[in-house]
């Protein structure tokens, strides 16, 4: 008579038939709505667990009105406190601690892909740069999706400026206070060629010859040093020579 919780009923084949809310050892047929059991809630109707209730449900729970993510009639307390996505009404929504967070703007990972969420909902219309938590770093989003493997020079708006920007590992690094150090920081390619990059932006005003070099590992013990010479005219690389200097 001391048991209070959910009890499962099985058919003659041993398969679960349904589940019921038991209070003090007896099925409580008078219970309707959300019932708290330990650290989670269940939704019952005339004492029976509504196991076919799934997805987002609008309800007032513990005095808090909101949209809640329900799994087979059960609302779990998500103590991990991270964002997940849940599909409802043609949209994907950001859920935090089992509740839709309409104030959230940022990224949420789902099935190995990071999505851009705006005001609690994945914005599939978003293509362009968005702020990140890292200083001077902007993530490039295509149709709401962030692709960390994306490289290239793309035309977009960044901080109110429309220009050609370098995207590397899905991000553009651009500082409002960066100073010219005498040569391009790096180079980025698109369908029109290879371009000189200064402070994350294609530098159309750069013309000249620029030399760079880097080491490449060829084994645990050995590496090679490659020297690069770029000829640049109005930001476009017109020729590039690579020379292996030593090994």
Give the ranges of each region predicted by the language model.
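Extracellular adhesion/carbohydrate-binding repeat motifs centered on closely spaced tryptophans
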Residues: 1-247
């Amino acid at each position: 008579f001391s048991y209070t919780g959910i009890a499962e009923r099985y058919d003659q084949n041993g398969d679960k038939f349904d589940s019921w809310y038991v209070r003090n050892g007896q099925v409580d047929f008078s219970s309707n709505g959300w019932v708290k059991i330990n650290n989670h809630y269940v939704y019952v109707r005339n004492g029976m667990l509504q196991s076919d209730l799934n997805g987002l449900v609008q309800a007032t729970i513990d005095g808090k009105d909101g949209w809640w993510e329900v799994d087979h009639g059960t609302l779990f307390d998500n103590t991990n406190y991270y964002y997940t996505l849940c599909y409802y009404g043609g949209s994907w929504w950001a859920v935090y601690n089992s509740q839709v967070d309409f104030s959230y703007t940022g990224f949420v990972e789902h099935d190995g892909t990071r999505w851009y969420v705006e005001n609690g909902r994945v914005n599939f219309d978003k293509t362009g740069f968005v702020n990140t938590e890292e200083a001077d770093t902007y993530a490039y989003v295509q149709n709401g999706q962030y692709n960390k493997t994306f490289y290239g020079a793309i035309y977009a708006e960044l901080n109110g400026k429309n220009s050609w920007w370098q995207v590397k590992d899905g991000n553009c690094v651009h500082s409002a206070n960066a100073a010219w150090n005498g040569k391009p920081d790096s180079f980025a390619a698109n369908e029109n060629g290879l371009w000189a990059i200064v402070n994350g932006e294609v530098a159309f005003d750069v013309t000249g010859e620029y030399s760079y070099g880097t080491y490449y590992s060829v084994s645990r013990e050995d590496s090679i040093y490659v020297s690069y010479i770029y000829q640049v005219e109005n930001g476009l690389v017109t020729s590039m020579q690579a020379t292996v200097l030593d090994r």
